[in-house]
């Protein structure tokens, strides 16, 4: 069972639907016991960084997320879910992130000919043998919707990058914690394969 953390953000049902498509059972929940008893946990979301942190704290889900990560349970952050795992964001200055991973969320720089938010398909450059990308081609195309991007403090945790106005850390992996700026649930067959790879973690070890 995969728990999808419900903190009032959008996009929860599309993640649930994608997991169903690959044959995985999931539950959308904010209940601590259901989350801690799940085999794996996903933190999805679209919206504003500060509002999301307020919601996580309101439901005490910030504490639950730290518990999950400390348990070495596989954890996946998607889009805003990636951003929340880091220290803070230009979008909501003065608001502390979850500090699960080290790095900052920065605004995508303005560049002539490019629209912000970045909405659409971009290819990834894979690196560091990320487990989410096992069996994928070298430059898979995935779907992005964002105005802010990750600059991780440690390049060793970065498993995929892309270019849009600047160099973007698009996916990271550290121990049991995985995160991607793009939306695997909206990324067609490549995205479903990424979710399959996440679902298989621990089953084949």
Describe each PLM feature range.
Residues 88-164:
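Pocket-forming structural segment of enzyme catalytic cores
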Residues 139, 173-178:
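Beta-strand-turn-beta hairpins that frame and shape the catalytic cleft
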Residues 167-173:
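Short, surface-exposed beta-strand/loop micro-motifs that present aromatic residues
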Residues 180-205:
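Acyltransferase
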Residues 47-119:
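Cysteine-nucleophile active-site neighborhood
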Residues 2-24, 184-186:
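N-terminal beta1-alpha1 ligand-phosphate binding loop
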């Amino acid at each position: 069972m995969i728990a999808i953390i419900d903190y009032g953000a959008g996009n929860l049902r599309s993640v649930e639907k994608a997991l169903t498509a690959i044959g995985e059972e999931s539950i959308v929940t904010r209940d601590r016991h259901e989350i801690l008893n799940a085999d794996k946990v996903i933190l999805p979301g679209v919206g504003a960084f500060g509002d999301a942190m307020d919601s996580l704290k309101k439901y005490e889900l910030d504490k639950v997320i730290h518990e999950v990560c400390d348990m070495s349970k596989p954890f996946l952050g998607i889009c805003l879910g990636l951003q929340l795992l880091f220290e803070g964001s230009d979008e909501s200055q003065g608001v502390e992130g979850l500090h699960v991973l080290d790095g900052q969320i920065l605004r995508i720089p303005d560049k002539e000919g490019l629209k912000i938010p970045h909405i659409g398909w971009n290819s990834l450059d894979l690196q560091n043998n990320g487990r989410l990308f096992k069996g994928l081609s070298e430059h898979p195309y995935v779907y992005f919707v964002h105005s802010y991007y990750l600059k991780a403090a440690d390049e060793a945790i970065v498993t995929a990058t892309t270019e849009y106005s600047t160099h973007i850390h698009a996916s990271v992996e550290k121990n049991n914690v995985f995160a991607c700026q793009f939306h695997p649930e909206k990324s067609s067959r490549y995205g479903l394969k990424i979710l399959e790879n996440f679902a298989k973690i621990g089953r084949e070890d």
